[in-house]
Design a protein with these regions (language model features):
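Tryptophan-rich substrate-binding surfaces of secreted polymer-degrading and adhesive proteins
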Residues: 1-191, 262-266
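Conserved, function-critical positions that sit in or immediately flank catalytic
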Residues: 140-288
Length: 288
């Protein structure tokens, strides 16, 4: 019987490890006084007896790790013009291996909800938008969701060339807190559970002479969309209302003089995008 280790399982395991620092004592060992062949890229660690023995032999100091010395993290992808980014897809079995979220030069983190090919418009242009989406459909076709900004203190301690720190706020920050924390709390508070931010075109159909009617049916409410037809084929779907509380939905296409179109919804995670960025960004890594 086949089985998989799910992202949720990995995140739960990571959470248990992070929480364990409050009641257990961990130390980080420091060693190897001689340089690596390339100091910016040390050798990959391996889990075998030889490596473990070598680590102990080279160790010359240990640092106690407190609960404030560890944070969830996700791979760092800096937004760069001319790059094609993947959009979030609730049915993509390889989503964790794709660049579906980015960090800007200002340490703002954005998730891609709709890809438009080569990205040319920096999502950072819109700045901090704690509700709704950043719609660049008229420029490069992308739609982004602002997730959070890495606080200055957090970034100076945990931001690396390969990973970004990710945190979930369990309570509202004090009014005088870092603006980044206040903005993140606003994003978490404004998250819409079960919203449909995108509809995928499985087949564009044929013979459409006008835009057909797109209907969203499911266990949620208020999701609406319109279709764009080019050359008799449905080529784009625009969400005019993302709705709420969907866990399942079916998209039907009627009218327009054509046939054969097939569409499917992309439903957001439990709680909505931004409610818990650790879940959205698959943060089953830690930075110490």
């Amino acid at each position: 019987m086949s089985a998989i280790i799910t992202s949720k399982f990995r995140l739960d395991t990571t959470e248990k490890f992070v929480d364990s620092l409050a009641s257990n004592t961990f130390y980080m060992g420091l060693g190897r006084s001689n340089s690596w062949p390339d100091d910016t890229t040390p050798d990959d660690p391996y889990e075998n007896d030889y490596t473990i023995n070598t680590l102990w032999e080279n160790m010359f100091a240990m640092k106690k790790c407190e609960s404030v010395d560890i944070i969830y993290s996700s791979p760092r992808t800096l937004w760069t013009s001319g790059v094609t980014y993947s959009d979030y897809d609730d049915r993509d079995v390889n989503i964790e291996g794709k660049n579906y979220f980015v960090v800007s030069d200002n340490n703002n983190v954005f998730m891609c909800l709709k890809s438009g090919g080569v990205s040319t418009t920096n999502p950072d242009i819109a700045g901090v938008t704690t509700s709704g989406v950043i719609d660049h459909a008229s420029t490069d076709g992308y739609i982004w969701k602002y997730m959070y900004t890495i606080p200055v203190d957090t970034g100076s301690k945990f931001l690396t060339a390969s990973f970004i720190p990710v945190q979930y706020l369990t309570s509202a920050p004090d009014p005088g807190s870092d603006t980044a924390l206040l903005n993140q709390w606003s994003v978490q508070d404004n998250a819409i559970d079960g919203a449909i931010y995108a509809i995928k075109i499985v087949s564009g159909g044929t013979g459409y002479t006008s835009a057909p009617t797109v209907t969203v049916s499911g266990n949620g409410t208020s999701a609406t969309a319109t279709a764009t037809v080019t050359g008799g084929v449905i080529t784009d779907i625009d969400m005019t209302g993302v709705g709420a509380n969907y866990t399942k939905a079916v998209i039907t296409v009627t009218g327009g003089g054509g046939s054969g179109a097939s569409l499917r919804p992309v439903i957001g995670p439990s709680g909505g995008f931004g409610k818990d960025p650790r879940n959205d960004l698959r943060s089953h890594y830690v930075t110490i």
